């Protein structure tokens, strides 16, 4: 019996690896759903505001290192995330970010080539009818407060007109994956157990037409959702 169980486990592992190589997006979303469900009680308000088809941009406050997991587990459509390019260059994570089709981005003064490529990729992704998610603050909060929304969203909308859906995450500040603890995440293992299976909520607002979008307006809407 132990031998049969071992063989069955090995076959399942091989099947999982094969599915990942063929359908990495499906596998990653499955993992996102699995991880979020065992760690949190996740609920979503306003899911009907996500367009059923066509390109759109999601914006969200940046509370922790697992924001993308919660969003991916909650929104049924595939999502491509825009991420600071230096994170995508971390050796052990390069393959993961590539398979997840993460779009690396840099500031104008850092790497103009990366920035230009990011804008082109974002535009093409939206034209292909896919969803792009950005965190307009540009950083994970260190205070729990909402930071200033950068104007990158306005640059994106200069070349293509798509709906923009404002969202906010609630319940992750103070978690093991946030920077509440001396500005460092993943540094207080005891917090992981303390907050285990806490409630996390994703609030999805009504989408805005591209011509009505400014970084300032999105920030105001986010603050209203957070109140």
Regions found by a protein language model. Give the residues of each.
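Alpha-helical transmembrane segments
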Residues: 12-21
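Helix-to-loop junction immediately C-terminal to a conserved catalytic motif
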Residues: 24-62, 127
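Catalytic core of membrane glycerolipid acyltransferases/transacylases, capturing the structured
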Residues: 38, 52-111, 174-178
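Residue-level preference for the first positions of well-ordered beta-strands
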Residues: 55-57, 129-135, 165
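Hydrophobic/aromatic ligand-binding patch that stacks against planar heteroaromatic rings
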Residues: 71, 96, 124, 155-159
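Catalytic-site beta-strand/loop segments enriched in glycine and acidic/polar residues
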Residues: 123-154
């Amino acid at each position: 019996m132990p031998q049969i169980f071992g063989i069955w486990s090995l076959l399942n592992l091989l099947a999982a690896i094969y599915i990942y190589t063929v359908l990495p997006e499906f596998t990653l979303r499955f993992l996102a759903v699995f991880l979020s469900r065992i760690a949190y009680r996740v609920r979503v308000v306003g899911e009907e505001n996500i367009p059923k088809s066509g390109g759109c941009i999601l914006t969200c406050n940046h509370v922790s290192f697992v924001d993308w997991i919660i969003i991916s587990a909650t929104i049924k459509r595939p999502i491509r995330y825009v991420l600071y390019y230096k994170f995508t260059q971390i050796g052990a994570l390069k393959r993961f970010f590539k398979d997840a089709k993460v779009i690396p981005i840099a500031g104008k003064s850092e790497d103009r080539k990366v920035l230009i490529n990011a804008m082109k990729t974002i535009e093409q992704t939206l034209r292909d009818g896919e969803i792009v998610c950005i965190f307009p603050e540009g950083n994970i909060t260190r205070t729990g407060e909402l930071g200033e929304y950068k104007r990158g969203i306005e640059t994106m909308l200069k070349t293509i007109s798509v709906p923009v859906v404002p969202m906010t995450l609630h319940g992750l500040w103070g978690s093991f994956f946030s920077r509440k603890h001396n500005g460092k995440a993943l540094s207080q293992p005891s917090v992981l157990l303390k907050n285990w299976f806490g409630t996390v909520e994703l609030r999805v607002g009504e989408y805005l037409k591209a011509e009505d979008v400014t970084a300032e307006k999105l920030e105001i809407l986010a603050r209203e959702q957070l109140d």
